Design a protein with these regions (language model features):
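Radical SAM enzyme [4Fe-4S]-AdoMet core and its adjacent flexible, acidic
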Residues: 12, 30-35, 39-42, 84-87, ...
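Conserved alpha-helical substructure of the radical SAM core
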Residues: 1-112, 123, 127-135, 139
Length: 222
């Protein structure tokens, strides 16, 4: 049997979410109740212990469709990865990533934290993420950046954004850069809207060659 070169494992440690983003399947159609809870820590560690002997040290993403920072014991999951020589990544709306949770997660050896920020100003953020948290998230991202520097942590700080109007790509990229990416200093990914939830029904027939949503052509894709 061919040996699988496993580079990334996505383990959902919390299935629910505290946001109701316009473009996300967590909002519409939603998830079954049995998925809206935490994965027990011992089950998580058991999974890690099955991975490492067979596949070495792939990257561990601590989320799937859920919001990982809603798991109150998040630093323990990160530490479990660190103890086994595994990198841990978190993709999050960032609304809980502050105070002790932020500091303890970074201290536990978190490899990367990515803020999802859809909308390049307060008004558009509110529209697409359905909550008026632009200023708060901006501050949390700054606090995270500062704590990483203060502690000489190797944790990377990223951000993720979507183009909202395909006819204004250059303008929106510039706005994301000026309003969030450059002031905070994140490594950013800006994608075209890709309707991955299937929430939107196009009223046209797609003609010609299909185009990419803009995912980075890297070895590790999200």
């Amino acid at each position: 049997m061919e040996q699988i070169n496993l580079q990334r494992v996505v383990i959902e440690i919390f299935g629910g979410c505290n946001y109701t983003c316009k473009m996300c399947p967590q909002t519409t159609p939603g998830r079954e109740k049995q998925f809206l809870r935490s994965m027990p820590l011992d089950q998580f560690e058991n999974i890690l212990d099955q991975i490492t002997p067979k596949y070495g040290t792939p990257l561990i993403n601590l989320e799937g469709s859920g919001e990982p920072t809603m798991n109150k014991n998040l630093p323990q999951y990160i530490e479990a990865c660190t103890r086994r020589g595994l990198r841990s990544y978190i993709y999050s709306n960032g609304s809980n990533f502050t105070g002790n949770l932020m500091r303890d997660s970074i201290d536990a050896g978190l490899s990367l934290f990515r803020f999802s920020v859809i909308g390049y100003n307060r008004e558009l953020y509110h529209k697409w993420m359905n909550v008026d948290n632009w200023d708060m998230i901006y501050q949390y991202a700054c606090d995270t950046r500062d704590y990483i520097k203060q502690t000489n942590s190797k944790c990377k700080l990223d951000s993720y954004h979507l183009i909202l109007d395909p006819s204004c790509v250059e303008y929106e990229v510039d706005q994301y850069q000026q309003n969030f990416i450059f002031p905070i200093g994140t490594e950013a990914y800006i994608w075209k809207m890709h309707n991955w939830s299937g929430n939107y029904k196009p009223d046209y027939e797609r003609l010609g060659q299909r185009r990419s949503c803009g995912r980075p052509a890297a070895d590790e894709l999200t």
